[in-house]
């Protein structure tokens, strides 16, 4: 059976929604840019001491801007570029390849009905999110 990307994407969206999984993608480059801009502006206004103050203020602002931007994992999965979706599906397919399914609904039922399989799918999804996307996972509302 060829890898059916749409079915696996729907499975991942269902499983992550069922687990109430959210993630935040680390935007460290944006935070670093804000910190650098703060240091630069501080240096222009206050000289060498201004660099320290501006860097501290910019760093705090950068940290604040990049923290707590949690999005539901189904939304993140749907927004992935096709190449990353394919890579994620390949990872999950290694887990579900022995199953025989005809559509996404049947695949979801097969996985959700088997706790061991469901745990493996969730673990692979978390692994992909944390390793490939450098995401931080959160459960619940």
UniProtKB/Swiss-Prot annotation:
It holds the Pfam family C19orf12. The chain crosses the membrane at residues 33-53. The keyword Iron-sulfur does not apply. Coiled coil: none annotated. One of its GO terms (cellular component) is mitochondrion. It comes from the Eukaryota. It is found in: Mitochondrion; Mitochondrion membrane; Endoplasmic reticulum; Cytoplasm, Cytosol. InterPro entries: C19orf12. Its main location: mitochondrion. Keywords: Cytoplasm, Endoplasmic reticulum, Membrane, Mitochondrion, Transmembrane, Transmembrane helix. It is a single-pass membrane protein. Belongs to the C19orf12 family. This is Protein C19orf12 homolog.
